[in-house]
Structure formats: C-alpha cells, structure tokens
C-alpha cells in the first residue's frame, strides 16, 4: 500500500502556486454590424479613439472616423470583401504611422508608405505619424528664400519662396501638373528633397510622370506617393498627409523640401464619399462641414522653420481642378483662402498657344518680392504692370481704328514680352537665363525683332551668353544681383547677338 506523504504534496502545491504566472491580456473588441462601400459600422468598441487603427478578422485595417453613442463608423484601407457581418474587430491602440527617412528617396510608395515600384523593401526603421501638429508661430520664420521653379513667368511675376503654400489652379488639361513637374526638375542643383503626391489619378498618368522624372534625373531626390483612381477612397484621403509626413522628416533635419499635392479636388471628393457613406450630414455641394479643416490642417504643415529649429522648410504646391474656370466654387475658394497665393491657368490662353498658360492678371503671390533674388527684383519689377497695361490696351485696340505711335509701340512691346514668357515643357531655365531675357524684353531690345522670331532669338541669346559671356552667368549666379559689370556684359551680348541674328 502506497503511503501518502502530506509534506511532499504540500511542497508540490507550493511550487505550482509559485510558478503560476497569470498574464491577462485586455483587448478592446467589437463586432461588425454592417460593411460595404469601403466603410463598416462596429458595435462594442467603447474605448476607441478618433483616428485609431482597427484590425479586422481577415487582416484588413480600418480607421475609426465616426464615434457615435452606440457604434463606431470606420473606413477601410482595403476592399473589405472578406469582412462579414458579425466578424470581430480589434482596436490596436495605435494611430496611423508611415515609414520616413533617406531610404524612401527615389521610391514610389502607396498612401501607407508601402513600396509599389517592384524594387524590394524599404530599409528604414524610422516612422512618423500621418497626422502631426503644424509648427506654431514661434517655430516659424518669415519666407525669405526663393524656391526657383525655372518658369520665367512664375519666378518673375508670381515668385514662390521656401516655406510658402502656392496654389496651382485651373481647368483640366491646362498644364497644372507640367508646372509642378518642371519645378521638381529645376531643384536638381538646389539640394531640395521633393515629394510628389498623386491623388486619384490614372496609374498610366502617374507612370508617365515617373518616367519624365527618371529621364531628367529627378528621381534621385524625389519620393512619389501614389493613391491611384482604383485605390480605396480612404487611401486617396490619406495620401496627402503621408506625403507631408515624409517631407516633415527632412524639414526638421534642416533641409529644404517641396511637396506637390496633385490634386486636392480629388482628395476632397474621396473625403465627401467617405463622409456620406458614414451618414455625416452634407453641406454645400454635398461636402461635409469639416472639408475646410482637412485642407487647412494639411497646408498649415508647410513652413519655413526658425534658425533655432534648423531653418528647414516645406514648400507646398497644392493643385486644384476647376470646372469651366469657376474659381468661386466651394473647394477652390477654400484652398485659395488657405494658401499664400495662386497661379491661375487659363484654358483660353492654353488653346491660343500661350504655354505655360498663366493668367498674370489674377495670379498672385502674397509673399511677393521677399521670395525673389535681387537680380530678378531689379529686372522684373515692372513686368506684371507692363503685361496688365498691354492686356488692357489690346482689348481697347480691337475697337479703335487708328492708334497713336506711343500706343502702337506699347502694344508691340507687350506682344514681344508675351512671347518671351512662352516656355516649352520640361525645360526650366536658370536664374541668369530668366534675368537676361526679361531684361532684353523690358528694355526694348526685342522691339525690332519680328514677333514670330522672338522665341528663337531668346533661345539663341541664352546659348550665346553661355558660350561667349559666361562671366555674366557666374556673376548673377554667385552674387544673386545684376551688378554694373553684369549689366554691361549683358548689353554687349545682346548687341553682338542681334548683329549675328541679322537685325
């Protein structure tokens, strides 16, 4: 018969009690009530935060947007085809973050920072919240450095500075993206990190843009964030914030950055779609009441930081598409009121062969000459006025039969100035080239040249200066102003080239 030893039993029980490890995992779990059209209604997520990431049973991730009394309205970052009514949802306790860092440069990513260019994983350990606070007043400095676009009409009349928000607005097919891409190409020697955010565009259009950037060697300093037309509305809504986060990383490291949001009309439409599906009350043009805030909180993140924070900058060039030139619609007026000026592209000018089709009359930069080099300020100060007076005279001259000599000469000069501002796509100009051509046009050196030959003369003059008067380019490039010596060299170059041109 086996003898029972109580002391042995008690020691075993004691060991078991001591080695017992009670780990309790508390998770906030809910149940799907309804799912469809990229949204879901969930019951039971009492502790959910606004903007919190939610994980569905099939691995789909969503964001809690509507926190209601008895349910949570979430938007999905995937198709959600495998989510069923009654399936469980877990709150992650996290807010959306994206990878940031040097490893992203030259890559094409989606709205969550995942690579979509087939070049393998992105090796970076750093992440940043998609939504982050914009710099405050003390953290900022006034815009004082130029962000050269390489487009004479913009750099001379509507200058953009580092840290500015300048809206590019116009009808479809008026060259909005072309201006943005030219600006990226022009940063090649400027040490600026560029982020191009494509929102709701055709994949073929985005591929074309990437092809242009690669051809011009611009992908070496550019990140492309693409939320294509076939991507869920949630990703189209998030893409601009992702681009801003990636640029912010470099801005806080003291670097200059440029972000292009192409275009925010499609982001607003994606947000309207999500809001209506979540049963939020519609307002003007069926947009929700907070559509202004989605753009203001995005564009306020662009800044020129104070020297104490490293002096970095984020320049934002948002794009807005208008319908039949109507800038008084809801989204265009919202974004115009948030930005520091707008470049208005006119379909009439575009169709009449004036490209870039910038309407100088209603385009404005609220930063103004603070964002111009001294050389450009000296030369182009009266360019906008000359063109405005010319446009007025041109309209008047259509009704007048005989014009006096002064009016005729002003009309002739205006026509030549307009020709000078024409520029082919993907061929941005250096500052000295812009200064030389603007100087020649404004000071009457082109008055004897026939209007159809002005563009040819301007291109030839630039080449002549590059080869024969390279010192002019050096002076303007290094001193950033038009010195007496530079002006003399320029006058000589114009006179010599006019002779060679046969004028």
Swiss-Prot record:
CDD domains: ATP-synt_F1_alpha_C, ATP-synt_F1_alpha_N, F1-ATPase_alpha_CD. ATP binds at residues 170-177. NCBIfam families: atpA, PRK13343.1. Its main location: membrane. Belongs to the ATPase alpha/beta chains family. Its EC number is 7.1.2.2. It is found in: Cellular thylakoid membrane. It is a peripheral membrane protein. The keyword DNA repair does not apply. Produces ATP from ADP in the presence of a proton gradient across the membrane. The alpha chain is a regulatory subunit. The record marks 363 as: Required for activity. Keywords: ATP synthesis, ATP-binding, CF(1), Hydrogen ion transport, Ion transport, Membrane, Nucleotide-binding, Thylakoid, Translocase, Transport. F-type ATPases have 2 components, CF(1) - the catalytic core - and CF(0) - the membrane proton channel. CF(1) has five subunits: alpha(3), beta(3), gamma(1), delta(1), epsilon(1). CF(0) has four main subunits: a, b, b' and c. This is ATP synthase subunit alpha. One of its GO terms (molecular function) is ATP binding. The keyword Coiled coil does not apply. PANTHER family: ATP SYNTHASE SUBUNIT ALPHA, MITOCHONDRIAL.
